């Protein structure tokens, strides 16, 4: 947080807008948001479990998330940014290729599948379907496809993670977008927090005592976690649809 404070001190002297990292952008964003909105009575320890967005705050995509921000701050050169952009363009192109490239059934392929404890293929299979299997890795595909053999090993992990966790990542990105849209959504004045499943006891008591007007205020109450806010948001949405 010292780095962020230094950046913002310099930006304030220049009359520029503050540099703020969101919870969905970096763990330091989670740390600062927790300290500012919730406070703490003891040393704060940043653990991955504190972030509700840890699926998208991964080590392998840190450059994709933060290089554009660093470039805006003048800390990342044009050349470095273009390398990062090129890297993830290549990853996306490879995923698209895996979707449209099939591998025929063969004794060698089925022997591999059997040895890994997964079902054989009898009519061939798209490469991406094989990679989605938990038992297989991208490197396993290199023996059956020239394109995979030619693909840079340094990028293979990013392809594998994107493919294997595609559904979970897409769901979390949708949660980020939805929560941003509903952050200022009003909370009914007559809401009964005792009826909301998923709220922890501490959160229920704090919300009932403070009576926040919207979800943004609720999320900034000490003792109310992002999971509590998500439960509250789901409850309000369900009542609106009734």
Predicted ranges, named:
Residues 50, 62, 67-72, 76-229, ...:
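Extended, charge-enriched "interface" segments that sit outside catalytic cores
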